[in-house]
Swiss-Prot record:
Protein name as it appears in the record: C-X-C chemokine receptor type 6
Annotated signal peptide: none
Positions annotated as glycosylated: N17
Origin superkingdom: Eukaryota
Any Gene Ontology biological process: immune response
Organismal lineage: Eukaryota, Metazoa, Chordata, Craniata, Vertebrata
Location of the protein in the cell: Cell membrane
A Pfam family per the record: 7tm_1
Keywords of this entry: Cell membrane, Disulfide bond, G-protein coupled receptor, Glycoprotein, Membrane, Receptor, Transducer, Transmembrane, Transmembrane helix
Keyword Glycoprotein: yes
């Protein structure tokens, strides 16, 4: 949902002179077009990508590792998350017409799945650290790790529900020039911001910095043809997280501590543009955490073949070659046991 909607039009316009009011009206028109369009793009891409990951994970890929457990829960959280975006897109163009119950429900669904996605990303990072740095121990305790992984995922969903209660309880529909779904309470907004910054940014960022630093050090001292590929993927994961999440979280932090920026129309543009960039994670997660796997890509081509699209795509030969290469690749136990991404 639009973070900007908690600070709606009337409050801004009252603090502006005539020139600033004209600029702000231009901004409101820009927001009315830009955010819904971005929401719909993220919705479509996230719906397709995360649905594919879920279908392949459930019907074509047995849960053989802790990473597999996480890669079922992550696209599920992202999928439910993006399914709330069409409602916010419509509300951005017009106003909130779905009532108070739907307001509370969608605020809860949106927030629960946001926290779940970020906490699972943190767990995936820690799991990769264990698989690479403690490879032998991780392999020998695979069954136990699978059990713990399911328990951890259940706990993540419960924790996400608990920390989302303020939005669910205090979420309401307000009439501020138009009907808005949100929470119009400064204390609640402060609590929500602190929780979002901690669980949704600083925790996964800290986990990535610590775990990936050790992983990189371990891989640099290791041999094998997987090293360079794994390092590239690590840097890609870190770069995508930093580029998509840092700007929006930085803007939210500035917004909460420097109220004078509220009189700057340029700052309002920054809020909604960085928000849209942050939501791209729901589209990119399937690529970063699933499609990098050779095993997953093999199962993807199986799905394409089963639904009858393979002959039309003209990739039957390539799919067969990819399948053979994947089988040859997976024959190496040592590589798979120590591979960070189980490629």
């Amino acid at each position: 949902m639009a973070e900007y909607d908690h600070y709606e039009d009337d409050g801004f316009l009252n603090s502006f002179n005539d020139s600033s009011q004209e600029e702000h009206q231009d901004f409101l028109q820009f927001r009315k077009v830009f955010l819904p369009c971005m929401y719909l793009v993220v919705f479509v891409c996230g719906l397709v990508g995360n649905s594919l990951v879920l279908v392949i994970s459930i019907f074509y890929h047995k849960l053989q590792s802790l990473t597999d457990v996480f890669l079922v829960n992550l696209p599920l959280a992202d999928l439910v998350f993006v399914c709330t975006l069409p409602f916010w897109a419509y509300a951005g163009i017009h106003e909130w017409i779905f009532g108070q119950v739907m307001c509370k429900t969608l605020l809860g669904v949106y927030t629960i799945n946001f926290y779940t996605s970020m906490l699972i990303l943190t767990c995936i990072t820690v799991d990769r650290f264990i698989v690479v740095v403690k490879a032998t121990k991780a392999y020998n305790q695979q069954a136990k790790r699978m059990t713990w992984g399911k328990v951890i995922c259940l706990l993540i969903w419960v924790i996400s529900l608990l920390v989302s209660l303020p939005q669910i309880i205090y979420g309401n529909v307000f009439n501020l020039d138009k009907l808005i779904c949100g929470y119009h309470d400064e204390e609640i907004s402060t609590v929500v911001l602190a929780t979002q910054m901690t669980l949704g940014f600083f925790l996964p960022l800290l986990a990535m910095i610590v775990c990936y630093s050790v992983i990189i050090k371990t891989l640099l001292h290791a041999g094998g043809f997987q090293k360079h590929r794994s390092l590239k993927i690590i840097f890609l994961v870190m770069a995508v997280f930093l580029l998509t999440q840092t700007p929006f979280n930085l803007v939210k932090l500035i917004r909460s501590t420097h109220w004078e920026y509220y009189a700057m129309t340029s700052f309002h543009y920054t809020i909604i543009v960085t928000e849209a960039i942050a939501y791209l994670r729901a589209c990119l997660n399937p690529v970063l955490y699933a499609f990098v796997s050779l095993k997953f890509r093999k199962n993807f081509w199986k799905l394409v073949k089963d639904i009858g699209c393979l002959p039309y795509l003209g990739v039957s030969h390539q799919w067969k070659s990819s399948e053979d290469n994947s089988k040859t690749f997976s024959a190496s136990h040592n590589v798979e046991a120590t591979s960070m991404f189980q490629l």
